[in-house]
């Protein structure tokens, strides 16, 4: 019997045995660095001459892995394989599909620290961030497996005398999963298994910065019993392989997590009907945010400062949910700003393989350059309070950066930076603070720190974000507890880890029988 869902607990690294186990996992992963990884098409390993070189962002000279790189021809082969596999996989019982997710979750749980160690090396995640990423991957498998079991018989509808009506869900077809580098295990696994458990076959194109952990997950699903051809692993260029698959007439849906610009490009391309295409493609997209924490004059100011720092600088601000705007009512602006600067100066920036590190590197040279450009813009648009320096000699390290007195319409208050940068804006009162908070094209996460119930209730209705938090930070949604996804340019309003997410990967069918 399947037990009720509970989220995977995070590891307590104050326990010596846990620390030792994690260090052992790091040593194991270090001994496996630099290996070659193939594509997986129909269960067959396919090596290519062209490779994606995955490096450790904390140490540019350390190669994590060399991964085969798909081209259009191999993508077409994978599409034909997935299309063929759909015929049998779509008819596999929901119970059997869910069981594969449960077995995969158990395998990852046994190897939890190993997967987290890969995240330390490939994504530059500090211990706690890596551990949370792995736990979330487990949660997605456990939660979506259970959700499929709830949906397997459909939803009851009314029937008249002499009539039986059934309303149930069937799979869509071949899905293209384009996963991000910032949650290279959790989001990659979640979007993949949501597509699989609903009876679809998948072409997985992971982010080029983090393809190794995705390959490791493909191995887990194979071990869990996933049939060959149901999941095909085809890392490659977005401009070549990504566009080709988005345009392909046999692609039924695209599940994308990434930037606003790429998401818009995919949405536009998917809307075009190509020769031989007999459906309108579905796009499930999560595209980022410009998230704010609002603090009113009746807030717990220490909680406010702690929440801003944790939300702005966890994983170097490389979360779509990260706090990049702090909007403070003028009565308490100076106190909150001063405390945030004080706390930020205490943060330990360094090698994520060291337990004491709070903040590691940003993901790559392009990200480093972009963030440093925004810091220069910030120096013109606001008052630099701390940080602002970068060092890319060995890895891609940027100091946590705080800007004060920024105009709500400034670029660093409007554009997604995706790095360790937070901008402070002063509001006249709470209404003005909400007005500033809603003044972007995004609508992903937000938080309000306040003891005033009327203000919280006002924010509940007027703060237009998909995930709104009261008296806590704006990051760290838990699967099944805080379904995650935003409004406006933050995506297609889907809610990962929520009760209606799987339905996006299926279509409803009604069967009516007279007797």
UniProtKB/Swiss-Prot annotation:
Residues annotated as the enzyme's active site: 286, 320
Origin: domain of life: Bacteria
Entry GO CC: cytoplasmic side of plasma membrane
Any GO BP: glutamate biosynthetic process
GO function term, MF aspect, one: 1-pyrroline-5-carboxylate dehydrogenase activity
UniProt EC number: 1.2.1.88
First-level EC class: oxidoreductase
Pathway(s): Amino-acid degradation; L-proline degradation into L-glutamate; L-glutamate from L-proline: step 2/2
InterPro entries associated with the record: Ald_DH/histidinol_DH, Ald_DH_C, Ald_DH_CS_CYS, Ald_DH_CS_GLU, Ald_DH_N, Aldehyde_DH_dom, Proline_metab_enzyme, RocA
Pfam families reported in the protein's UniProt record: Aldedh
Keywords: NAD, Oxidoreductase
Catalytic activity line of the entry: L-glutamate 5-semialdehyde + NAD(+) + H2O = L-glutamate + NADH + 2 H(+)
Alphabetized PROSITE patterns for the sequence: ALDEHYDE_DEHYDR_CYS, ALDEHYDE_DEHYDR_GLU
SUPFAM superfamilies linked to this entry: ALDH-like (SSF53720)
UniProt family annotation: Belongs to the aldehyde dehydrogenase family. RocA subfamily.
Stated name of the protein: 1-pyrroline-5-carboxylate dehydrogenase
Organism from which the protein derives: Geobacillus kaustophilus (strain HTA426)
Gene: rocA
């Amino acid at each position: 019997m399947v037990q009720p869902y509970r989220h995977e607990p995070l590891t307590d690294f104050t326990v010596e045995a846990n620390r030792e186990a994690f260090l052992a996992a790091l040593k194991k992963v270090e001994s496996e660095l630099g290996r070659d990884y193939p594509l997986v098409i129909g269960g067959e390993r396919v090596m290519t001459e062209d490779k994606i070189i995955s490096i450790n962002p904390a140490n540019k000279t350390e190669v994590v892995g060399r991964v085969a790189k798909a081209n259009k021809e191999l993508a077409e082969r994978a599409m034909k394989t997935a299309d063929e596999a759909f015929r049998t996989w779509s008819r596999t019982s929901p119970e059997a599909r869910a069981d594969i997710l449960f077995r995969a979750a158990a395998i990852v749980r046994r190897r939890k620290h190993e997967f987290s160690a890969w995240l330390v090396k490939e994504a530059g995640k500090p211990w706690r961030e890596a551990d949370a990423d792995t736990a979330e991957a487990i949660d997605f498998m456990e939660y979506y497996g259970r959700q499929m079991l709830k949906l397997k018989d459909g939803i009851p509808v009314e029937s008249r005398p002499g009539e039986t009506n059934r309303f149930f869900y069937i799979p869509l077809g071949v899905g293209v999963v384009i996963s991000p580098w910032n949650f290279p295990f959790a989001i990659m696994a979640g979007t993949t298994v949501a597509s699989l458990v609903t009876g679809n076959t998948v072409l997985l194109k992971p982010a080029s910065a983090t393809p190794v952990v995705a390959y490791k997950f493909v191995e887990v699903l194979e071990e869990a019993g996933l049939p060959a051809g149901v999941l095909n692993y085809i890392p490659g260029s977005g401009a070549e392989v990504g566009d080709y698959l988005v345009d392909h007439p046999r692609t039924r849906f695209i599940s994308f997590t990434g930037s606003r610009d790429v998401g818009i490009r995919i949405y536009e391309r998917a809307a075009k009907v190509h020769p031989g295409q007999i459906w309108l493609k579905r796009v499930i997209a999560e595209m980022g945010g410009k998230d704010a924490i609002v603090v009113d004059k009746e807030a717990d100011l220490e909680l406010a400062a702690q929440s801003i720092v944790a939300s702005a600088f966890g994983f170097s601000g490389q979360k779509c949910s990260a706090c990049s705007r702090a909007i403070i009512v003028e009565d308490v602006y100076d106190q909150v700003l001063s405390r945030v600067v004080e706390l930020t100066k205490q943060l330990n920036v360094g090698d994520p393989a060291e337990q004491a590190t709070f903040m590691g590197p940003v993901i790559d040279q392009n990200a480093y350059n972009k963030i440093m450009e925004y810091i220069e813009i910030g120096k013109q648009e606001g008052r630099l309070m701390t940080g602002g320096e970068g060092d890319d000699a060995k890895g891609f390290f940027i100091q946590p950066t705080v800007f004060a007195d920024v105009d709500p319409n400034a670029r660093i208050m409007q554009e997604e930076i995706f790095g360790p940068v937070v901008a402070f804006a002063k509001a006249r009162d709470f209404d003005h603070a909400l007005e500033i908070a809603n003044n972007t094209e995004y609508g992903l996460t937000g938080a309000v720190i306040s003891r005033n119930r009327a203000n919280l209730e006002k924010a509940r209705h007027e703060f237009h974000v998909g995930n709104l938090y009261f008296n806590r930070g704006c990051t760290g949604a838990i699967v099944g507890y805080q379904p995650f996804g935003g409004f406006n340019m933050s995506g297609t309003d889907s809610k990962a880890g929520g009760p209606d997410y799987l339905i996006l990967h299926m279509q409803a069918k009604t069967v009516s029988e007279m007797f």
